[in-house]
UniProtKB/Swiss-Prot annotation:
Matching Gene3D superfamilies: 3.30.230.10
InterPro entries for this protein: GHMP_kinase_N_dom, PoK, Ribosomal_Su5_D2-typ_SF, Ribsml_uS5_D2-typ_fold_subgr
Top-level taxon of the source organism: Archaea
GO molecular function: ATP binding; kinase activity
Protein name (Swiss-Prot/TrEMBL): Pantoate kinase
Annotated function: Phosphorylates (R)-pantoate to form (R)-4-phosphopantoate in the CoA biosynthesis pathway.
Source organism per UniProt: Methanocaldococcus jannaschii (strain ATCC 43067 / DSM 2661 / JAL-1 / JCM 10045 / NBRC 100440) (Methanococcus jannaschii)
């Protein structure tokens, strides 16, 4: 079972006393690399790329399904192209596919995406990834949480998404800080309004760059590389992580790859 990675270009933090309606609005793209899950007989351990880990959102999902008879007779094994904390939605992806898996395993008819979203919100590890990963594609989230209200934009399949990961960033430290929230929401709303007027991939990546720079969230090294990649469709930083993403057409792909040290090439995942 697979969940795609999710690149968030920009977002607005939306808080509510109702966890289902807490989340974010904004825009992002899902990619064809992400995370897979399998369950094996065991003692309830969680593994991510062969390393025993604690993933808060995953633990919340497990807690929920224990009410319906799930027990710790299984180890949960996630495998991914990306590390946790890189701004590519891996925490949300793990929660989403595990909720789907347990829903099927226990023959339940629950809205597993809602369970995963609430788990992420409670842990402070994400606000909108689960919704985008559930819907898939180039997704503009118009209202936070559930019920889902998005605009899916169809784009040509001749775009490549190039990623380079430069390290981790703690989502919770930013989305719970009032100074960051004010900056993020001011520029996020502007970018969302502009994208809705002209919902193209080119406009998305340019607005993502503006958001990253204006909020001050962009890493200096990534900023410098974005300047070098201006011959492509555009480049920015995936929110919230120290990960560069670049959108390129085929004719500029090789030149773009030559600038990066450890590039990962993806396609948009629908």
């Amino acid at each position: 079972m697979f969940a795609p990675g999710h690149i968030t270009g920009f977002f607005v933090i939306c808080k509510s006393s109702n966890k289902l309606k807490t989340g974010s609005i904004g825009a992002g793209i899902t990619i064809d690399r992400g995370v897979n899950v399998e369950l094996k007989e065991g003692n309830g351990s969680i593994f991510y790329n062969n390393k025993k880990v604690n993933i808060c959102a995953v633990e919340k999902v497990i807690e929920h399904y224990k009410k319906f008879g799930y027990n710790d007779d299984y180890d949960i094994i996630f495998s991914s192209d990306f590390p946790l904390g890189s701004g590519l939605g891996m925490s949300g992806g793990c929660a989403l596919i595990l909720a789907k898996k347990l829903n099927e395993m226990l023959n339940l008819n629950e809205n597993y995406a809602e369970i995963a979203h609430i788990s992420e919100v409670e842990c402070g590890t994400g606000l909108g990834d689960v919704i985008a990963q559930y819907v898939k594609g180039f997704v503009i989230r118009k209202t936070p949480g559930f019920p889902i209200n998005v605009e899916k934009i169809v784009v040509d399949d001749d775009y490549y998404i190039i990623i380079e990961i430069f390290g981790k960033k703690e989502t919770k430290e930013i989305i719970t800080n009032d100074i960051w929230i004010k900056k993020i929401n001011e520029y996020g709303e502007r970018c969302l309004n502009e994208l809705l007027k002209n919902p193209t991939l080119e406009n998305f990546v340019n607005l993502s760059y503006e958001f990253a720079v204006n909020t001050g969230l962009i890493n200096e090294k990534i900023l410098s590389i974005c300047e070098d990649l201006k011959f492509t469709v555009g480049a920015s930083q995936s929110m919230l992580g120290n990960t560069l993403f670049c959108i390129s057409k085929k004719e500029t792909l090789e030149d773009a790859l030559s600038i990066l040290k450890n590039p990962i090439v993806c396609n948009i995942y629908y």
